[in-house]
From Swiss-Prot:
Entry function: Catalyzes the phosphorylation of the position 2 hydroxy group of 4-diphosphocytidyl-2C-methyl-D-erythritol.
One protein family per Pfam: GHMP_kinases_N
Positions of transmembrane segments: none
Organism of derivation: Thermosipho africanus (strain TCF52B)
One Gene Ontology molecular-function label: 4-(cytidine 5'-diphospho)-2-C-methyl-D-erythritol kinase activity
The protein's name in its UniProt record: 4-diphosphocytidyl-2-C-methyl-D-erythritol kinase
EC number(s) given by UniProt: 2.7.1.148
Binding site for ATP: P94, M95, E96, A97, G98, L99, G100, G101, G102, S103, A104
Family: Belongs to the GHMP kinase family. IspE subfamily.
Alphabetical UniProt keywords: ATP-binding, Isoprene biosynthesis, Kinase, Nucleotide-binding, Transferase
Annotated active site: K14, D134
């Protein structure tokens, strides 16, 4: 949609159809094994040229916003352009919910800068992992198996015909806090690999989808966040499957027939362009 000559980029939320932690690395990061899926809930970034630098306006608090980190790292690597940008960020993705909103926004700005200055995706991916562990996925988007700390991404053919409902909690969970509560004895406990779960979705096998849905962080929230576990149980009564996404606090339910959101095949994309 054209907004006063701006370029509008959509940044889509993600859910983790499965999420396991393999190990904690010596550098403090955790290695994951997960099936990521973008959904049709999105933030909107309206971007216009200005004389210099990066300005951000938003409907939420923007202090230390990840978009500043994107700009700083981009300018550090490629030198600051002769002109800058104003970003009007319309936040619709709940924060601290495990839906990847901040990472999606970062990828959206990186995507825009890459297109504007003709930088190949391979270079953008190298920059993305320095911004945040989930950012590379959003540059690729859709359906993918994600490993390592988020930098190992295997895109898979898009899953279609699935719908999603979300329930959020009043109290968000910071990723750092959630990982700090993980006990190594919980690592590598997923009942299926992400590939087995993907095939179950591909074949629309409801029983196998339910069996293979897994999120290691449910072991953490079970003892500390009763409201979240209640939300999972609520969605499991009405959907094929339901689980926590990311490290929480949002939970999702998947359906064949209807839902507020649907699976999408992009992490970021232009809504309409006019620069």
């Amino acid at each position: 949609m054209e907004q006063n000559g701006s370029t509008v980029v959509r940044a889509y939320a993600k859910i983790n159809l499965s999420l396991d932690v393999v190990k904690k690395r010596d550098d403090g990061y955790h290695e994951i094994n997960s099936l990521f899926q973008n959904i049709s809930l999105y933030d909107r970034l309206s971007i216009v040229k200005i004389d210099r630098g990066l300005e951000i306006k938003s409907n939420v608090e923007i202090e230390n916003n990840i978009l500043y980190k994107v700009w700083d790292l981009f300018c550090e690597k490629y030198k600051e352009p002769e002109f800058g940008f104003r970003v009007i960020l319309e936040k619709n993705i709940p924060m601290e919910a495990g839906l990847g909103g901040g990472s999606a926004d970062a990828a959206a700005l990186l995507f825009f800068l890459g297109k504007t200055f003709k930088i190949p995706t391979s270079e953008l991916l190298n920059l993305a992992i320095k911004i945040g562990s989930d950012v590379p996925f959003f540059l690729i988007g859709g359906t993918a198996v994600v490993k390592g700390k988020g930098e190992k991404i295997e895109p898979l053919p898009a899953l279609k015909g699935y719908y999603v409902d979300l329930l959020t909690s009043e109290n968000g969970i910071s990723t750092k806090e959630a990982y700090s509560l993980l006990n190594p004895s919980l690592f590598n406990r997923a009942p299926c690999s992400p590939y087995v779960l993907y095939e179950a979705y591909k074949n629309r096998n409801a029983g196998e989808i339910k069996r293979c849905t897994y999120n290691i962080f449910e072991k953490v929230v079970a003892n500390n966040y009763k409201e979240i576990m209640a939300n999972i149980k609520r969605l499991r009564r009405t959907h094929i499957t339901a689980a926590l996404t990311g490290s929480g606090s949002a939970v999702f339910g998947v359906s064949f027939r209807d839902g507020k959101y649907k699976f999408v095949s992009r992490g970021v994309e232009y809504e309409e362009t006019k620069l």
